[in-house]
């Protein structure tokens, strides 16, 4: 993989800049946008970026930091899913707490924003409190967004409980957008100033990158990633007017800035030090870019990947046609097409060959599916669905054989291992879908490795699949999707269901 980003330089630059901000105040509240951990989007568009870079920045400042996690009550009730991990927001809060503690970062509390007394929310709060985690309930802000006098009063932010903090830097994060991070920060500012403390507010958003051109693929990839939010990158007019400098921001921050500035000035009783939404940010990611062309190419691939993802989401009923059309427009606006993702053509060609073989045999029953992997050295490996295993499982085994320099005809897993598993699924468990998925095939390979040295060698190559690009001719089942993700394989799919069943194999 070609590198286009200097991770170490970024860590130094970012931690230094945050410290400079906090030095102006008794305390600094930082609203952390995007992913605090496992920022896979940033990793894909900035080759060389560490997906856990943000947590490493915080770790460098851990003696000065504590973390507040926000989650919107409505997202708990609706079981909103974090797309890149396939887990609900409430479960992602638990994951966040574990990860923060593992990195020696203090978790202050969890805030339920726009709180309403509903069953799922009540259960979530109980589970947190019984594990010794403080929970605060914050309500919808009275007067928001137009009545600043009510917002900044005991009837507005004053109705929320004050969160006791002890560190000079308070990071406010969440599982995803719309979780109430900004409202929590402003509520805390209100309470802090009422207590006579001089506190500040800043925002840490990785994207869009303010000092990269508006139409750069890196910034357009952010639009593709947030197409469901209808985010649009814009030149920051406030920054341009105040400093005569071009800076990129996005529509929601620019639209909210005049109100946000008024609220902060009302809370502090003095003129805001920020003259633009860009001023509020502490992001230094643009200074870590070392090869613009590498970043451009990676960002273009991400735009295509997002198009496929949105298409599958539309097919599954998880998004609307307008969102999919926006994703398609973004891809076409850069002159990109589906086939610019190399593995797409190979997967489709494999399916064509399989269909031709099926026609030759006059086989009308068999449902065919294929997948293609692009290995780190550019080699294309394919897999097909069979009665024994599904296409991703076959591609994984074929890839491991390639990485191990084994003959393609070699059977890595003995039929004596596979047949009892198939029998268990079909006869005992009475499963409707029999072929082994990625999890099952990897367990079978692990068992085989105990007595088969070749299987042991193949198993040792699994880590080399990280970063592999893949494309499936059919929408993958949840299990396969999750296991490919765990292996670090970036997979896209055509908008075609593998069967006509509505429940089985989805």
UniProtKB/Swiss-Prot annotation:
Q: What is the official name of this protein in its record?
A: UPF0371 protein FN1121
Q: Which family does it belong to?
A: Belongs to the UPF0371 family.
Q: What is the lineage of its organism?
A: Bacteria, Fusobacteriati, Fusobacteriota, Fusobacteriia, Fusobacteriales
InterPro entries found in the cross-reference section: DUF1846, DUF1846_C, DUF1846_N
Q: Which NCBIfam families match?
A: PRK13663.1 (NF010184)
Entry-linked HAMAP family? UPF0371
């Amino acid at each position: 993989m070609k590198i286009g980003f200097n991770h170490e330089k970024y860590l130094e630059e970012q931690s230094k800049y945050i410290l400079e901000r906090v030095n102006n105040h008794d305390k600094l509240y930082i609203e952390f946008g995007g992913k605090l951990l496992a920022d896979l989007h940033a990793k894909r568009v900035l080759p060389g970026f560490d997906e856990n870079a943000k947590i490493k920045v915080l770790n460098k400042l851990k003696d000065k930091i504590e973390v507040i996690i926000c989650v919107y009550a409505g997202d708990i009730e609706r079981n909103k899913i974090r797309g890149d991990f396939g887990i609900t927001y409430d479960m992602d809060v638990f994951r966040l707490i574990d990860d923060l503690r593992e990195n020696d970062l203090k978790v202050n509390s969890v805030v339920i924003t726009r709180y309403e007394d509903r069953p799922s929310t009540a259960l979530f709060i109980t589970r947190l409190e019984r594990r010794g985690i403080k929970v605060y309930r914050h309500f919808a802000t009275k007067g928001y967004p137009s009545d600043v006098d009510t917002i900044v009063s005991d009837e507005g932010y004053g109705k929320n409980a004050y969160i006791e903090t002890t560190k000079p830097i308070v990071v406010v994060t969440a599982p995803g957008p719309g979780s109430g991070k900004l409202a929590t920060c402003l509520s805390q500012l209100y309470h802090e100033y009422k207590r006579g403390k001089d506190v500040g507010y800043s925002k840490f958003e990785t994207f869009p990158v303010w000092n990269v051109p508006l139409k750069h693929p890196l910034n357009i990839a952010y639009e593709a990633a947030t197409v469901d939010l209808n985010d649009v990158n814009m030149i920051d007019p406030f920054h341009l007017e105040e400093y005569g400098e071009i800076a990129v921001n996005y529509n929601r921050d620019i639209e909210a800035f005049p109100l946000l500035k008024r609220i902060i000035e009302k809370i502090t009783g003095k003129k805001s030090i920020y003259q633009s939404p860009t001023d509020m940010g502490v992001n230094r990611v643009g200074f870590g870019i070392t090869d613009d062309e590498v970043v451009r190419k990676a960002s273009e691939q991400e735009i295509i990947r997002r198009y496929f993802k949105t298409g599958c989401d539309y097919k599954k009923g998880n998004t609307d046609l307008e969102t999919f059309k926006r994703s398609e427009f973004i891809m076409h606006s850069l002159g990109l097409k589906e086939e610019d993702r190399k593995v797409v053509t190979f997967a489709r060609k494999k399916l064509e060959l399989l269909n031709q073989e099926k026609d030759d045999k006059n086989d009308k029953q068999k449902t065919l599916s294929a997948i293609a992997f692009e290995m780190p050295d550019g080699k294309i490996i394919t897999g097909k669905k069979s009665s024994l295993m599904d296409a991703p499982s076959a591609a994984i085994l074929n890839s491991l054989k390639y990485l191990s320099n084994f003959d393609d005809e070699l059977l890595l897993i003995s039929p004596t291992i596979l047949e009892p598993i198939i029998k268990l699924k079909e006869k005992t468990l009475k499963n409707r879908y029999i072929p082994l998925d990625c999890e099952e095939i990897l367990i079978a390979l692990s068992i085989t490795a105990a007595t088969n040295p070749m299987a042991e060698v193949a198993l040792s190559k699994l880590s080399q699949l990280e970063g592999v690009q893949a494309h499936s001719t059919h929408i993958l089942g949840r299990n396969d999707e999750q296991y490919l993700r765990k292996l670090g394989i970036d997979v896209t799919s055509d908008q075609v269901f593998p069967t006509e069943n509505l429940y089985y194999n989805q």
